[in-house]
Structure formats: structure tokens, C-alpha cells
Amino acid sequence: MLRSVWNFLKRHKKKCIFLGTVLGGVYILGKYGQKKIREIQEREAAEYIAQARRQYHFESNQRTCNMTVLSMLPTLREALMQQLNSESLTALLKNRPSNKLEIWEDLKIISFTRSTVAVYSTCMLVVLLRVQLNIIGGYIYLDNAAVGKNGTTILAPPDVQQQYLSSIQHLLGDGLTELITVIKQAVQKVLGSVSLKHSLSLLDLEQKLKEIRNLVEQHKSSSWINKDGSKPLLCHYMMPDEETPLAVQACGLSPRDITTIKLLNETRDMLESPDFSTVLNTCLNRGFSRLLDNMAEFFRPTEQDLQHGNSMNSLSSVSLPLAKIIPIVNGQIHSVCSETPSHFVQDLLTMEQVKDFAANVYEAFSTPQQLEK
């Protein structure tokens, strides 16, 4: 039996060698294919887990953004009410002073300035914090992902995070003061000559606010210039025009300072981007629309108007003397800068454009390949 097998192999030696080679190759290829399939499956599973982890971290970061905005609104409201103190003027009016008309004129300017600044500063706060917390959130994600790896350097240690995030104080301090000055000048120009007895409809009020916005957003006080020669929208109120105090120091910068300066420069780049201007402008449009919605209830037609056939679909038929509109406008700050989620703040926090922009910022700073560019 063995001899016949041996003779068969000798007679078909080349065929047997070829067959053995083919079978061996098939076996090796099969093993190699199985190994590659396992590697692909493991890589896909790792990528899925990493993506899920990053998505969870992103969503958690957005909740932190929302909570931070709400926690800072009382500080913003207090700063506004301190610099634009209309309450002291209303208290004076209760005493029937001889210069009542002069006080009413001051109250007119301060009331419109305060509500307009409230809309601008709240929108800026929402979008700026989205940028800052998603930049730092991206770095924190990379730091967490690198835990346990040898030779890795922490990108954003806690002291750097604190130093970087403290830059928001510019918006609540010098930036807010400058914004108040510019808006007050615009309000004076648009409404200064309007008599307290002059009646305005809601549409008239909307037009006046548009005129104020045009003056504010075309103001040329900023030295910020984009690479294409254009001026970024309102950026100098959120970050100072000049170099940061840290960067001014020619020497003696600590590694923490250098990292903070890098984060601030990256923030500047984001603020100068067309996407940021688009999102901020969208927020401002929504904010002023919501402000008008809040005041619309005071422009409802009365029963007498309805009986006389003045029931138009719009509220253009209902007009109020400016003196009656001033208290309405003056009280809007409590709705705009409310730490209890009002319709105004809720609208800004849940806007799809804001969410998409936040996702893009987080994506850019939570991907190592992007940071290396």
C-alpha cells in the first residue's frame, strides 16, 4: 500500500509539489485574511468606542456651556444695571422734580441703551463661551485619551484652563463698558430727537432698533482687521485689540503662560472666522426678534380698537406714546439676562447654528491631526 502511494507520488512529483504549494498558500492566505479581518474589526470597534466616548464628552461639554452661560448672566445683568442705572431716575421721577422732562429724556436713552446692550452682550456671551469651552474641551478630551501613554505632555493643565477662561472677564468689564458707550451714542442719534409724546407702533420700534444696530455694527473703533481687510463682527468687545498682557512680556514667560497665549491666539482665530460672524449675527437677529416678541403683548389691540375695525393681522395699527414705551423697554433686561432659562436665553442656547458651530470647534480641537496643522 505504502509502495503504491510512494510510486504514485514519484510519478506525479511535480503535480504533488504544485498542489502542496497551492494548498499551503491557501492556508497561509486564509490565516492572513482572518488576522486582517480581526484587525479591521478591532480597529472599527476601537474607533466606534472612541467616537462614542468623544460624542459623550462633547454633549457633556455643551451642558457645561449652558450652565456656565446661565451662571454668568446675573453678573452681566448686575454690571449693566450698575453702569446704566435707570432705577435711580425712576426714583427721582416719583418725587415730581422740576426737571422732570430732562430726567425723562435721560431715562429714554438709558432704557433703550440698556436693553440693546443686554441683547448684544448676552448673544456674545453665549457664542464666546461656546468657542472657549469647546476649544478647552477638545484639549481635555485629548489629555484624557492620552492618560497612561508614555512621553505624553498634558495639553491643558487645570491652571492653564483657569487662566484661559478668565479672559471672559474682558466682555464683562472693559469690553462691556466700550459696548455701552458705542450703543448709547447710537441710541442718542436715533432716538434723541424723538419726542416723548410721539407715538410708535411695534413696526416703528423694530425699525428704530435696526437703525441702532446698523450704527453699532458699522462702528469703526476697532483696530481688528481680517486678512481680507474686513472687520470681524464685534470681536474687540469680547477680546482686547492689543496683545494680551502675557504676550507683552518679552521674557520670563512660564510654560503655563505660553500655553495660555496659544489658546488665546486660537480663540482670536475663531472669532475672526466668517463662521463666527455668521453665527453671532444669527443670534443677534434671533435675540432682537425675541425682544420685540416680549414687547408685543403691550401692543395688543384693545376692545375699542377691535370694535372700530382696526383688527389687522400685524400690530402696526397699535401705537403708544414713547413715554409709555420707555418702561416696557426698561424692564426687558430681566427677561434677556435671566439666569432662569427664559424664552430669550433658551432660544439662543438651542439654536441649530450654535450647536453646529460648537460641534465644528470641538471637532477641530479634539482631533490630534487637526492640532498638528
From Swiss-Prot:
The UniProt entry's GO biological process terms, in alphabetical order, are: peroxisome organization; protein import into peroxisome membrane
Give one Pfam hit by family name: Peroxin-3
Q: Which domain of life is it from?
A: Eukaryota
Assigned keywords, A-Z: Disease variant, Membrane, Peroxisome, Peroxisome biogenesis, Peroxisome biogenesis disorder, Transmembrane, Transmembrane helix, Zellweger syndrome
**Regions that span the bilayer:** 16-36, 117-140
> Do the record's keywords include Transmembrane?
yes
The entry's cellular-component GO terms read: endoplasmic reticulum; membrane; nucleoplasm; peroxisomal membrane; peroxisome; protein-containing complex; protein-lipid complex
What is an example of a GO molecular function annotated in this UniProt entry? protein-macromolecule adaptor activity
Coarse class of the primary localization is membrane
Which segments carry the region annotation Targeting to peroxisomes? 1-45
Task: Tell me how this protein sits in the membrane.
Answer: Multi-pass membrane protein
Name the reported effect of residue 125 to P. Answer: Abolishes binding to PEX19 without affecting targeting to peroxisomes
Q: Which residues lie on this side of the membrane: Cytoplasmic?
A: 1-15, 141-373
Q: In which tissues is it expressed?
A: Found in all examined tissues.
Task: Report the subcellular localization.
Answer: Peroxisome membrane
Q: Where is this region: Interaction with PEX19?
A: 120-136
Peroxisomal side of the membrane: what ranges? Answer: 37-116
Clinical condition linked: Peroxisome biogenesis disorder complementation group 12: A peroxisomal disorder arising from a failure of protein import into the peroxisomal membrane or matrix. The peroxisome biogenesis disorders (PBD group) are genetically heterogeneous with at least 14 distinct genetic groups as concluded from complementation studies. Include disorders are: Zellweger syndrome (ZWS), neonatal adrenoleukodystrophy (NALD), infantile Refsum disease (IRD), and classical rhizomelic chondrodysplasia punctata (RCDP). Peroxisome biogenesis disorder 10A: A fatal peroxisome biogenesis disorder belonging to the Zellweger disease spectrum and clinically characterized by severe neurologic dysfunction with profound psychomotor retardation, severe hypotonia and neonatal seizures, craniofacial abnormalities, liver dysfunction, and biochemically by the absence of peroxisomes. Additional features include cardiovascular and skeletal defects, renal cysts, ocular abnormalities, and hearing impairment.
Quaternary structure, per UniProt, is: Interacts with PEX19.
Family statement drawn from the similarity comment of this UniProt entry = Belongs to the peroxin-3 family.
What does the UniProt record say this protein does? Involved in peroxisome biosynthesis and integrity. Assembles membrane vesicles before the matrix proteins are translocated. As a docking factor for PEX19, is necessary for the import of peroxisomal membrane proteins in the peroxisomes.
Per its record, how is this protein called by name? Peroxisomal biogenesis factor 3
Tell me what organism the protein belongs to. Homo sapiens
Q: What is the lineage of its organism?
A: Eukaryota, Metazoa, Chordata, Craniata, Vertebrata
